[in-house]
Amino acid sequence: MANILKKWVESDARELKRLGKKADKIEALKEEMEQLNDEKLKAKTTEFKERLQNGETLDDILVEAFAVAREAAKRVLGLFPFRVQLIGGMVLHGGNIAEMKTGEGKTLTATLPVYLNALGGKGVHVVTVNEYLAERDSSEMGELYKWLGLTVGVNSSEMTPDQKREAYNCDITYSTNSEIGFDYLRDNMVVYKEDMVQRPLNFALIDEVDSILIDEARTPLIISGQTEPTVTLYERADRYVKTLADGDYTIDWESKSISLTENGIRRAENFFKTDNLYDVENSALNHHIDQALRANYIMTKDKDYVVSDGEVLIVDSFTGRVMEGRRFSDGLHQAIEAKEHVEIQDGAKTMANITYQNLFRMYRKLSGMTGTARTEAEEFREIYNMEVTTIPTNRPVARDDRPDLLYPTLESKFKAVVKEIRDLHIKGQPVLVGTVAVETSEYLSRLLDREGIPHVVLNAKNHAREAEIVTNAGQKGAVTIATNMAGRGTDIKLGPGVVELGGLAVIGTERHESRRIDNQLRGRSGRQGDVGMSQFYLSLEDDLMIRFGSERIKDLLSRMKIADEDAVIRSGLISRQVESAQKRVEGNNYDARKNVLQYDDVMRAQREVIYAERQQVIMEETSLKDVLMPMVDRTIDRVVDAHTQKTQKNFDLETIVEFARTALVSDKDIHQADVEGMSAKEIKDYLKQLADQMYIEKEKALYDPAQILEFEKVVILRVVDQHWTDHIDAMDQLRQSVGLRGYGQLNPLVEYQQEGYRMFNEMITDIEYETTRLFMKSEIRQNLQR
């Protein structure tokens, strides 16, 4: 550990020295900038933009741009960034994390890299933990950016898509992390490019970066959609396929695929009262019929699945065991439930999902600032490729951080906490009490009420009220109880006469499992060189001590217990033992987050393929023939390959021709005699020629290339979206089940990767087959809705 610390200190010192030289250059421009009148200073923005267009880089103009933004901040905000803030700004511009203590002006520091990067014209996102902070910072700092000729937007959950688009099109956009995530997912579900709101993700600067990238890293953002109407569709499809006779469908047992014959198609059109089963409007119906066919004629009860207590359970074909928690994908499970007349489990379906880890790793450049990141430096480096640099404080820290006090019981600990609060309150010194849980803050509040000590309780519920309470927490005689995260982002300024009383006293009622959260609480006191004090009160009955308290501490306390219930140990040993317990918990939490990321990376790779495909389709402005016809060709290749494995005279021509009739052309356009005597390659070429002719006929039927393009978009998007949402569900089921089973001696992650890859390839095959069938067999109509 000592070596790691030494490395950090040395690398920080090197980095600060390097950036210090640049800061000197910015400082050297101070007088030159002061000489410029307002118009000339504002004109610098246009000059910088032109220089960037002429080939200069952001790094080339950094020194001048920082000097301009610094002088503008003085004129507009009445604030002049210190030298340490210039260094912090450069760390952020470099795509790294600036660790700046509370009160060191993070918000002002951010204006420098935000201004510089906004000059590139690709958009800068300033990300905050709540909408109140986004509103506050955008209106306060927005004055500066607007004065310098840049546009500023704020993105919130109440906005319409048009308002969001306007906010994202600004040079600088303030938003919460969750709103950016949901907008990204929604953008990848739209069917018209005009409905998208975001531009490509360029540069994000995250405030309270540890909270978003570490504490919330495992939180998935999920968009769900209800799917109740499809329950009846499963039942109707099931009733229909149960009426079929042998000649109405063909089964290919090798690939376990099944399709309707021309006869079966006619029966379906009568049953469902539709003119053309393969019309685009019937894509959902087709999907349900396909699954009902598989459920009834391919899947066998007590071999592929069992029915137990009204539930369909999968049987593992290798072990013969029931696979708890797994469901067949792509709607097959629901089709079997309809077949067996048990309840169809088809509630909310996940339409799209992503974790913050993968969302923010998609930005071209990512940076962040916080008062506490050093303890998580390894995680930031390994997962986000961001280095943490600790920025020196503008003035030396004058806070008195006292050693922990340890009591035998919770009761004796809280007795001591209340006594300390009372003593400080009588003196008039403001007190901020930090609790780990909401119930602790309420319990302590009741104790203070009993003592008649006026106080305010702050639970992170009302952000606007929260800021007001935090602002007043530094006034004479104030007693504020707050849970961990409450009030981050708002400074506690000391009221008149408080410095003389010793500044803000911070009391921690227990140690959090993360050192970072404890450091955040301490850091509320002693801002900008103010005096202050911090003290943690612990007991042997605290969660952390019960889980990780070492034997040495327990021995000490067993001796204490005999002496006095209210006895206290004040010792560096306690603090060291607690810290080592915290490090163990942090290590466990990091491993858990890393594990989540490894699983999520499988989904990320798949998501990127599907979203890129959708983007290509949505953005296309002339023709999708180059996307669509290769899908048709690959589908033909797969079908022909599967049925020409044997010698030529044993080719399964009947199935190949049946495929051509149901997915490519009409009955009269192909007969078995047409492909007799052909090699596999000749059959493929012949079918591809038929498909090309079919495409040309569709072009002729419509005349208008715009309508053909629209038709192509409708077909591809409907099929892709249907299969992708089913696939997300299936991957979710797979993930839960590999965790449950642990696959004996096998690595669950490897199993998830391999099985997930197989399922994804299967989905792509299904998408291409269904797109082929829908496009080739549909009649193109005008005014189609995507």
UniProtKB/Swiss-Prot annotation:
It is a peripheral membrane protein. ATP binds at residues 85, 103-107, 491. The keyword Metal-binding does not apply. It catalyses: ATP + H2O + cellular proteinSide 1 = ADP + phosphate + cellular proteinSide 2. Its EC number is 7.4.2.8. Coiled coil: none annotated. The keyword Methyltransferase does not apply. GO terms for cellular component: cell envelope Sec protein transport complex; cytosol; plasma membrane. SMART domains: SecA_DEAD, SecA_PP_bind. It is an enzyme of class 7 (translocase). It is found in: Cell membrane; Cytoplasm. GO terms for biological process: intracellular protein transmembrane transport; protein import; protein targeting; protein transport by the Sec complex. Keywords: ATP-binding, Cell membrane, Cytoplasm, Membrane, Nucleotide-binding, Protein transport, Translocase, Translocation, Transport. It holds the Pfam family SecA_SW. Monomer and homodimer. Part of the essential Sec protein translocation apparatus which comprises SecA, SecYEG and auxiliary proteins SecDF. Other proteins may also be involved. Belongs to the SecA family. This is Protein translocase subunit SecA 1. The gene is secA1.
